[in-house]
C-alpha cells in the first residue's frame, strides 16, 4: 500500500466514489459514533454527517455494535443477524491511516437481494 497521507476530504471523496451506488446505507463513522459521511441510500433514509449512528432507531438495535472492536484491533469485523429479509451481515471496516474512522454497513437488512435476482 502506498504511504501517502490522505486528507479527510480525499477519504470522503473516495468513499462517495466507491459507495454512493450501493443499495444499502453505508457510512464512515468515528469511534465516538459520529457519522462523518453517508452514501446516497443513507441520505435517502435520513442519515447525515454529524449525527451519532447509535441514535438511529431503537437502542436494542445497537447491542451487537462492534465498532470499538474494529477500531481497537484495526481488523475488519463482521457479524450475522436476522435482518428484514432473512440472514443479514454487519460490517465494521477500519480505514487505513485514520485510526478512529471505520466504514460501517449491513447487507441484507434494507434491500431484498433475492427479489432483485428475479
Please name every model-derived segment.
Residues 2-37:
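Sensory modules in modular signal-transduction proteins
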Residues 56-85:
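Terminal output helix/cap of sensory domains in signal transduction proteins
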Residues 95-118:
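Sensory coupling linkers of modular signal transduction proteins
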Residues 40-52:
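PAS/PAS-like sensory domain cap-loop motif
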Residues 85-92:
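A short beta-strand signature within small-molecule sensing/ligand-binding domains used
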Residues 32, 41, 98-99:
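Residue-level recognition of short loop/turn positions
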Residues 37-41, 107-110:
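Short beta->alpha transition motifs characteristic of CBS
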Amino acid at each position: 500500500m502506498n504511504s501517502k497521507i490522505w486528507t479527510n476530504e480525499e477519504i470522503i471523496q473516495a468513499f462517495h466514489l466507491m459507495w454512493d451506488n450501493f443499495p444499502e446505507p453505508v457510512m464512515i463513522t468515528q469511534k465516538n459514533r459520529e457519522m462523518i459521511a453517508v452514501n446516497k441510500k443513507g441520505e435517502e433514509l435520513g442519515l447525515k454527517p454529524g449525527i451519532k449512528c447509535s441514535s438511529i432507531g431503537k437502542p436494542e438495535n445497537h447491542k451487537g455494535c462492534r465498532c470499538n472492536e474494529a477500531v481497537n484491533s484495526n481488523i475488519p469485523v463482521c457479524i450475522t443477524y436476522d435482518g428484514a429479509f432473512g440472514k443479514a451481515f454487519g460490517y465494521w471496516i477500519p480505514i487505513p491511516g485514520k485510526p478512529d474512522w471505520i466504514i460501517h454497513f449491513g447487507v441484507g437488512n434494507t434491500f431484498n437481494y433475492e427479489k432483485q435476482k428475479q
